[in-house]
Amino acid sequence: MASLLLEHLENKAAVDEAIRGTKNRVLVLRFGRASDTACLQQDDILARCERELSKMARLCLVEAAQVPIYCQYFDISLIPATIFFVNGQHMKVDYGTPDHTKFIGAFRTKQDFIDLVEVIYRGARHGKSIVNCPIEKSHIPKYDLIYKDI
């Protein structure tokens, strides 16, 4: 199992520490469930990329049920959801979808993930807080946002 090779954050305090403590690298947080097939596919891609991205990214897995406060804050209702931070700042990405705060679904290829992390890393180094997604539009999962209680 690829997820055994990646760092697991077990609670809110661990997630907070990872966000505050990761300096000069992209922090990638994958929110999901270990039993979900899409999460397992995502974990496999993350594990295969970890060595190549070790100088520019820290990859962590977060069990969504263990940190409900972050799931509520980032409005994580579909999994896997991948969120990016650099030096404690939440990085947003224009995926061509209504939500720029997170990537919903699994990445299709290892290269898609590597390209995205590189663009976020370079954008953050130039002071940007939002970057354009380099992933082909056909590789980005489609979904509709449904707003409750408006």
Where are these regions (language model features)?
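A structural signal for the main folded, soluble domain(s) of proteins
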Residues: 21, 28-31, 37-41, 91-93
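Intrinsic disorder/low-complexity signal
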Residues: 1-5, 130-150
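Non-catalytic, surface beta->alpha helical segment in thiol-disulfide oxidoreductase systems
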Residues: 77-79, 84-138
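Short amphipathic alpha-helical segments embedded in low-complexity Lys/Glu-rich regions
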Residues: 32-36, 45, 60-67, 96-102, ...
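Intrinsically disordered, low-complexity, Ser/Thr/Glu/Asp/Lys/Arg-enriched terminal regions and linkers
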Residues: 3-6, 52, 119-122, 126
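Thiol-based oxidoreductase modules, predominantly thioredoxin-like and allied folds used
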Residues: 6-11, 29-33, 40-43, 47-69, ...
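Short hydrophobic/charged patches on amphipathic alpha-helices used for structural packing
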Residues: 16, 68-71
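A short beta-strand-turn-helix
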Residues: 8-26
